[in-house]
Amino acid sequence: STTVMRLVQLLGFDSYTTFKKALAQESLLKNTTPYRSLRQEFSRTSETASRDTFHMAIADGIQVLENLCTPSNISQFEAAIQLESDQLYILGMRSSKALALYFEYVAERFYPHIRQLSREEEFVYDRIAINTTPKDVLLVYSVWPCTKKTIRVAELAHNLGIPMILITNTSLNPLVKIADVVIDTNSVNHPSGDTALMLVTEALMSELGRRTAPESTKNIEKIEQALNDNGLILWEN
């Protein structure tokens, strides 16, 4: 053990425990990728029946959802809802962009205080620096592999005192260290990992609508009335 401790110290670590933790994290970094599970799915033999693919996708989705409901995620969900804001800014880039846009698409119908940052990436620094205040909240979607620009923009918001909610699929996400609230679906190595991210999104929107009632309800009623008045309930070409 003396030889091991000398090696650990030679590598720049204070203790064997610290060395093991760093080694484990490095191993996860090397082997954690959402693309690995996709490659495995695509490489299955052509003899596999379509119904088997359907069943396997459902089974993986169920496992992902079971892993989502942890005491930590439950408490962090509550903490996210408790954050009050003048404006809710949404950020998601690359593989996280669809989630950010979906949140805006649904929530803005009943909650008009949403500002989307994901469409004009060239000006995202400007909007954070000029428009946001500590009374706002930044909701960040950042799934692995994390986009550098997302991390830098989130760090800028953090330095400006903007509270941050992070929705991610792995605890390896660098923003875990600075986010005020972290909901980690732990689904990075699952082909159905986005299922959990969508469920978190739906839950956040549902609770947001409930807590902003009756304003949220009135906004939905206004939309329904406008659609009825203009004959748009049954869409025409």
Please state what every model-predicted region is.
Residues N73-S85:
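Glycine-rich phosphate/diphosphate-binding loops that line cofactor/substrate pockets in enzymes
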Residues A22, E26, A80, K222-A226:
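Short acidic/histidine-centered micro-motifs embedded in hydrophobic/aromatic stretches
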Residues E215-N237:
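A short, charged, Gly/Pro-tolerant segment at domain boundaries
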Residues S1-S75:
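HTH-adjacent hinge/linker in prokaryotic transcriptional regulators
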Residues L83-T212:
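Glycine-rich phosphate-binding loops that contact phosphosugars or nucleotide phosphates
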Residues G12-D14, E207-S216:
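Short helix-capping/linker segments at secondary-structure and domain boundaries
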